[in-house]
Amino acid sequence: MERRKRPRLQLRLNVEFSSAEGQAGGFGITDNVSAGGVYFLTPDWQGLRTGQNLALRLSGMNNSTDWPVFRTLGCKATVLRLDVPPDRKVPHAKAGVAMRFDDRPRVDMYGLTA
C-alpha cells in the first residue's frame, strides 16, 4: 500500500547538500522528487545521519522553451532515511537518502530568486 501523500516524479537532477555545522556535505543525483521531499543517491553519505538538517540545492536544465533555462531550487530539509550500501568499503559506493523539505523550495533562475 502506497503511504506517500504526494506523487513522485522520476527526475534526474543534480543535488548539492551541506549541514550548518559543516560536518556533512557533498553531491548526488535525484532518483525522484515530490512537492514534499526528495530521494537521491550520493557517494558522500558517510557524514549523514537520520534527523539531520541540511541545506539542499537541486539543479537541472529545463528545455520547455526554445533555449534551455538553467534552474536551481534551494531549501532546508531533514534526512528521514539513509539506505547505506551493503558493502560500505567499496570506494565511491552510493547510499540512498530520503529527505523531507522543511520549507518551500525557492526557485533561482540565472541567479535571480523568484
Per-segment meaning from a language model:
Residues 1-114:
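Structured alpha-helical
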